[in-house]
Amino acid sequence: MAVKMRIGRRRAIQQGIAEGGFEWRRVWGCREADSRGALWELVWGERSVRERNAAGAAEEVIALFIMDEMCDPASNLEYVVEKAKCDVHRTSSAEEFFTEYGDANRYRIQEVIGKGSYGVVCSAIDLHTRQKVAIKKVHNIFEHVSDAARILREIKLLRLLRHPDIVEIKHIMLPPSRRDFKDIYVVFELMESDLHQVIKANDDLTKEHYQFFLYQLLRALKYIHTASVYHRDLKPKNILANSNCKLKICDFGLARVAFNDTPTTVFWTDYVATRWYRAPELCGSFFSKYTPAIDIWSIGCIFAEVLTGKPLFPGKNVVHQLDLMTDLLGTPSMDTISRVRNEKARRYLSSMRKKDPVPFSQKFPNADPLALKLLQRLLAFDPKDRPTAEEALTDPYFKGLSKIDREPSCQPIRKLEFEFEQKKLSKEDIRELIFQEILEYHPQLQKNYRNGRERATFLYPSAVDQFKKQFSNLEESNGSGSAIPMERKHASLPRSTTVHSTPIPPKEQPLAASLKSSRPVSDEPCKNPWVMGGFSGNIPTSSQVSQVAKPVAPGRPVGSVFPYETGSTNDPYGPRGPVMSSGYPPQQQISQAYGYHQVPARMNCVEQSQAMDAYKMHSQSQTQAYAYPNSKVTADVALDMRGSTFHHSAGSKNGSLDRMVTQTDIYTRSLNGIVAAATSAGVGTNRKVGAVPISTSRMY
């Protein structure tokens, strides 16, 4: 009965909308009559005409939302209207966030989790995978060449450095045009907070927490340094965290790759690192050759802050910073001072009064003695006295936890990847390089681009169109279905997303030979979806051949961004071939790599009429697809396979990362369903780490 009443109210609302207004009292019997216009005024107040017009597409959604909330006559109208206003405002914000980027249809924005001079970071739901992600919008990246170079450096390094303790880029949205785009949208895995917030919000962290935190940081640093990459800006805010104690290093914008035959290994003059976590040799450009020890120092400062809950060296300027360092570590030896590069800094240290080092057991009275011994090594004033990340992992502090031979190392990065660092580039040059990085996450378009078959503009349905589709799907199912409509209800209907691209060569179209035409054909994309034959690239999962990813060269995305795992390129029934699926019963469609349609060369009115009739018959009966024999096969859509719910990554079985992932249970234990501090069979008792309560902060 309640369901029938609800449907009846829905119909009454719809009828009222169609008639231009409705009465609250007549529908619910609990409110005075109110027209649709007055209700809209309640929701939007005195907002501008432009804002009202932009939100006009959501008006019916508000009405239906209010109807659902008001099934109970005792519901409060003001509360319902306010809630509807928030939901529509969130939709409007999403449209403003994504602007004209077509991938907006794939993500549902939830809330802003970070803001800065670079742009905005929002949490979102990936509607393809149902996973939570963080989308970082970097706006006006080409306003300053230095900022654009930093963005290019970061997305390139995060593509090259794939490690569980380094934040992962899942996707980069394709811009509407490669020649004049200004913003980029980078999709990261979502992390709940950062280490700065964890330290600030928790005063009851245990020794196991401390150990596991440091272990993860050193493990990530070992991987980074084996690639000859120096992060140079490690600090708590650049270390993301989850409540399960998982840490991930982010923000590689100031990082550099050191090649043995380039000046970068000798001297860097640009600003590096936040002062509080900056190594002594960076405070005054002390040493002629920087080493990975600059990151080891930063890790030591972070670990000390974890132990005490406050920064170790909060210097107000460079001189104050040096004073704080020498107050704890003592005056450096004359041998160390003699190798200081900066003359002023050398004179200052030489004239400094003699200071004795403070015992770390006195500075950190409640800390584990083994932890303090390692910390003292990490904070050695002279960089040559600091251990490498690999040496630190073998310290007795990690006995029973670390298995250094199983920790992965990164293959050397090719010098060609960072050749742009040695040249003076224009904005257009950097724009092109960033676009090439974006194409790394769109494999088929990248292939077309490299073969010279890429168009400059891509067309997508707008976010508003997708919003309307979701509303229509809810309306048709009387509110009981999903808000996310199927890609296509019939196999013969065209896909919603179109990417302008030339056809795949015949050698990659095993079934296209039978469709070759002897008449002239048009190279224009089909503009009338009703005048074409329908072929679907959607084949049931059971008929698709699994494909194992081949090992890829360093610098190529692996795992989750592998494009064609559900079908072989040589398989005539694979997703890249034009296959008729009319023999299969109607089913929910999943996004495949390609679908094909035919573009007739010339058609008169009679032929168009016949084509329309044939198309309608095909849609109703689901018989064999109607086709024009004299036509040209062209690509209708290029979609990212990672969105498919049936997609599974298939990286190299012999890769060091895969081995490490399968061995994580050796280092971690589960406590109430979350990752806890790692233990080993060699330890007498199981040590446990509880969840860390954290709060959301600026991230990425």
UniProtKB/Swiss-Prot annotation:
The modification Phosphothreonine is found at T269. ATP binds at I113, G114, K115, G116, S117, Y118, G119, V120, V121, K136. Residues 475-523 are annotated as: Disordered. GO terms for cellular component: cytoplasm; nucleus. GO terms for molecular function: ATP binding; MAP kinase activity; protein serine kinase activity; protein serine/threonine kinase activity. A motif (TXY) lies at residues 269-271. Activated by threonine and tyrosine phosphorylation. Residues 107-398 form the Protein kinase domain. SUPFAM superfamilies: Protein kinase-like (PK-like) (SSF56112). Gene3D superfamilies: Phosphorylase Kinase, domain 1 (3.30.200.20), Transferase(Phosphotransferase) domain 1 (1.10.510.10). The active site is at D233 (proton acceptor). The modification Phosphotyrosine is found at Y271. Dually phosphorylated on Thr-269 and Tyr-271, which activates the enzyme. Its EC number is 2.7.11.24. The TXY motif contains the threonine and tyrosine residues whose phosphorylation activates the MAP kinases. Belongs to the protein kinase superfamily. CMGC Ser/Thr protein kinase family. MAP kinase subfamily. This is Mitogen-activated protein kinase 9. It comes from Oryza sativa subsp. japonica (Rice).
